Amino acid sequence: MTDIIATEVAPEAAEALAPVVRAPLGDRPIQTVGRRKEAIVRVRIVPGTGKITCNGRDLEAYFPSKVHQQLIKDPLVTTEKAEEFDVIANLRGGGTTGQAGALRLAIARALIASEPDDRPALKKAGFLTRDARAKESKKYGLKKARKAPQYSKR
């Protein structure tokens, strides 16, 4: 019986340890996650016509506010890929503003996964920064996080 010595590495095994280079996007969907406040968004982008779907509804139906629609489309407009990808988003938790911010972050991350050369433009515009602000917790003895009960001198 022959023992295999761990220090010996065959040339084929050395090649197997080389870093993996991903194939071009093709028809493979890219999945990313974005978070803001209490909102969590999972996004899949696939090559398409530029349609954005949120929880099975159209973007305009899910986010009636033009401000939120503009906020969400900004990464696609900045990279000039608004007509190249279809975005399918699963949104959970939070309110409309939190969900819109989380969706923008997820789309920006997905665009980088598809085309790493877009990173400097998205970074400069601030689309890759996770907004870490969250609601401050309420303290005992206070009415809210910082609001004290009314003070009566007498």
Curated annotation (Swiss-Prot):
InterPro entries (UniProt xref): Ribosomal_Su5_D2-typ_SF (IPR020568), Ribosomal_uS9 (IPR000754), Ribosomal_uS9_bac/plastid (IPR023035), Ribosomal_uS9_CS (IPR020574), Ribsml_uS5_D2-typ_fold_subgr (IPR014721)
Assigned keywords, A-Z: Ribonucleoprotein, Ribosomal protein
GO biological process: translation
One GO CC term on file: small ribosomal subunit
Alphabetized GO MF terms: RNA binding; structural constituent of ribosome
Origin: domain of life: Bacteria
Cited PROSITE patterns: RIBOSOMAL_S9 (PS00360)
Biased composition (Basic residues): 140-154
Region annotated Disordered, chain positions: 133-154
PANTHER family in the cross-refs: RIBOSOMAL PROTEIN S9 (PTHR21569), SMALL RIBOSOMAL SUBUNIT PROTEIN US9M (PTHR21569:SF1)
Family classification: Belongs to the universal ribosomal protein uS9 family.
Entry protein name: Small ribosomal subunit protein uS9
Gene this protein is translated from: rpsI
